[in-house]
Amino acid sequence: MLTETTITKLREMRLSVMANALKDQMADPQFQNMAFEDRLGLLVDAEWNARKNNHLQKLIRQATFSEPGACLENVEYIPDRNLKREDLLRFGTCGYIQEHHNILLLGATGSGKTYLACALGMAAVRQFLTVRYIRLPDLLVDFNIARGNGSIRKLLAQYKKYSLLIIDEWLLYPFEYAGREQTV
């Protein structure tokens, strides 16, 4: 009876993962002989892991990656791509973000620039940094709409909040073609 009340209270406190873990512990006889601190630790770990995972998934969704499955570990180091493993591993630590440096990826169409940019973005997200991926034409459309309805400052403030802003298709098209009509 006391366990059901505790589980109900945990759910009311929005600790549903902990409540489910407690229910599982009560049903599994191997937990009965564990020390209280050990069982409590397992319950807290379950809740903490679920919350961290949910936060990570939210950051991935908010980043709007074109390739959300991209990761630096899967980059192919083909000789004609001139990629250096040590450079990418260093970029994967996201030190350039804390130092407020930029990375510009250059290469022919189809050489993997978008994948690499998304992989760098995923490395940042895995460190719980806020990331936003956007194509330059879409960014320019956003700016033109904001300029038209007077919300340009709000849009700029929104983009300033990200730890990493990935602008894909940078200058792939002339600015006029991409929808740019005035200076930002």
Where are the regions a protein language model picked out?
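Charged, compositionally biased N-terminal leader segments and the immediate start
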Residues: 1-20
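Conserved nucleotide-sensing/catalytic segment adjacent to the nucleotide-binding pocket
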Residues: 150-184
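Dynamic helix-loop-helix/coil hinge segments at AAA+ ATPase domain boundaries and subdomain interfaces
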Residues: 7-9, 61-84
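Interdomain "pre-motor" coupling segment immediately N-terminal to P-loop NTPase/helicase cores
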Residues: 16-68
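Short glycine-rich substrate-engagement loop in P-loop NTPases that contacts/grips substrate
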Residues: 81-89, 131-160
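Phosphate-binding P-loop
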Residues: 92-100
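Walker A/P-loop
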Residues: 104-131
